């Protein structure tokens, strides 16, 4: 299956340059100017984002929220209802499976918006809380692997907003004044989850200018797919890959 992955649009809805089977969106979708305002965010998702997403040259859109998506934190169920009847699937610490016709491969996608806490942003929970959520996620993934593996080959994708600690978590943009340019600032609970879950690939955003080339963590390929730099200017192209 051909995937295309993006993150950290912050309201910039550029059309995909090439078709794919599935679009993965790793959060921070809403414009910065609307992020704290429920009425404006709701209208933007309904009138701008959903029409854009449904017009992209893909069969399925799978997405999580990010720390700027306050409306999704408060009204995720309402957004899911908005998406009913479309091919947009919104995940909040959930596992789904997708497949292609006449193909023995099935793809399990676990999506989480949870981020390492700093400041007063959306979906930021203490790491112990996150570990409990991820323990439930791991149990669900392993149960489904056991059920499905006799009949299908299973590939797994972890779609997260945050970056895991230790890989793909060093910001490279020198103009980022609050950062020393060398410290790992990823999410330790997420890194532990990856080590235990062993997905084929982790797609993330959040840290805009970390390395966009693949890095490895415990056998899992980790890729940052943010579109913008730390100044919120478009700096990267969508990431295409096959699995």
Language-model features: locations:
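Charged helix-capping and loop-helix junction motifs
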Residues: 39-49, 77-80, 126-127, 175-176, ...
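Conserved beta-sheet core of the metallophosphoesterase superfamily
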Residues: 60-64, 167-243
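Active-site-proximal beta-strand elements of phosphoester/diester hydrolases
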Residues: 1-10, 26, 106-118, 156-161, ...
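Short, Asp-centered acidic motifs that coordinate Mg2+ and/or phosphate
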Residues: 22, 155-157, 200-201
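Short acidic-hydrophobic surface loop/beta-edge motif
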Residues: 92-104, 212-217, 241
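Catalytic metal-binding/acid-base residues of hydrolase active sites
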Residues: 10, 30, 67-70, 95-96, ...
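Active-site-proximal loop/helix segment associated with metal-binding centers of metalloenzymes
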Residues: 33-37, 102-184
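Core catalytic region of metal-dependent phosphoesterases/phosphodiesterases
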Residues: 6-100
């Amino acid at each position: 299956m051909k995937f295309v992955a993006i993150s950290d649009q912050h309201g910039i809805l550029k059309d995909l340059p090439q078709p794919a089977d599935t679009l993965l969106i790793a959060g921070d979708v809403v414009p910065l100017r609307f992020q704290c305002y429920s009425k404006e965010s709701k209208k933007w998702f309904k009138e701008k984002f959903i029409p854009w997403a449904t017009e992209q040259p893909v069969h399925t859109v799978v997405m999580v929220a990010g720390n700027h998506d306050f409306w999704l934190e408060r009204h995720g169920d309402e957004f899911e209802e908005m998406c009913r009847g479309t091919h947009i699937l919104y995940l909040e610490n959930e596992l789904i499976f997708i497949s292609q016709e006449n193909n023995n491969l099935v793809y399990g996608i676990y999506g989480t918006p949870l981020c390492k806490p700093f400041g007063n942003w959306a979906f930021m929970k203490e790491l112990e809380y996150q570990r409990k959520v991820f323990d439930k996620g791991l149990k669900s993934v392993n149960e489904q692997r056991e059920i499905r593996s006799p009949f299908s080959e299973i590939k797994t994708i972890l779609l997260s907003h945050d970056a895991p600690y230790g890989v793909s978590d060093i910001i490279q943009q020198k103009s980022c004044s609050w950062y020393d340019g060398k410290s790992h600032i990823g999410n330790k609970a997420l890194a532990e989850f990856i080590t235990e879950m062993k997905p084929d690939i982790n797609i993330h955003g959040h840290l805009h200018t970390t390395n966009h080339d693949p890095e490895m963590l415990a056998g899992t390929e980790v890729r940052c797919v943010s579109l913008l730099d730390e100044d919120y200017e478009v700096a990267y192209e969508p990431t295409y890959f096959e699995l």
